[in-house]
Amino acid sequence: MLKKKILLWIDYSFLHFGIANYFSKLNYDLFGIVDSEESINNFLQNQKIVSFSKLWYLYENLSPSQPDMAYLKIIEEKYQINLWSIIYTDRYFYNKFNPFYKFEYNEILSLIEQECKLFEKILSESEPDFILTNTITHHYQYLFYKICKSKGIPLLTLEPLRFANKWMITNGPMYDDLDISNFNKSKSVQLSNNDINKLSTSSGKIYLKNKLIKTEISKSKKFSAIFNFI
């Protein structure tokens, strides 16, 4: 029986490195995209905790060059995406929000081109059955999601509900392709103050749509996990 392949997006939080550690004990092939600084790259290259089939280091694959406009046009047609609509989602490309560096037109397109080439290479080599990532906060994560969505590859994000300690697993950004017209059809739920207090003080849980998939973790298991990690 062939192993299922999981591609994980690993950043400085190490959240998905921990998730990879869990899946490493099961029958899965693990791959990773590393979106972090050099010190963390060095750790991942030398650690013996999780065995990855392959890791790709995002920033090591990006360097200034003249953009290939023909290639970018092919990408837009191939995946049915508007690259500028993705670029506009990233605050770092705006002078107002990024006083440290002003990106030029060609620099932005060059970055997008190299990111597309890297993502196509990663997906071609890893052929993942599904992808696990954190909250999508940068243009390149959103670009990666759009490519995966076009290719029909499930991409699951772990999203904070911003209420107590609740989290939700979603199929991409929570509000992607949001149909505002449905708001008028949705039913509001009235909660009492007692209900709200219970929700805000209860232990963290993870939800998939309306189904609870993980209940609270006991204190003994938490301590056991700490000692196992150490």
Please provide the spans of the model-predicted regions:
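Nucleotide-activated donor-dependent transferases that construct or modify glycoconjugates
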Residues: L2-S13, V34, L132
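Conserved nucleotide-sugar donor-interacting segment of glycosyltransferase catalytic cores
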Residues: K117-S181
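A general structural motif
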Residues: L2-K4, N27, E127-P128
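A conserved donor-nucleotide-binding helix/loop in the catalytic core
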Residues: G18-I19, L118
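Short, well-ordered alpha-helical microsegments
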Residues: L15-G18, I40, H139-Y142
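Conserved N-terminal ligand/cofactor-binding loop architecture of enzyme catalytic domains
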Residues: Y22-C116, P160-I230
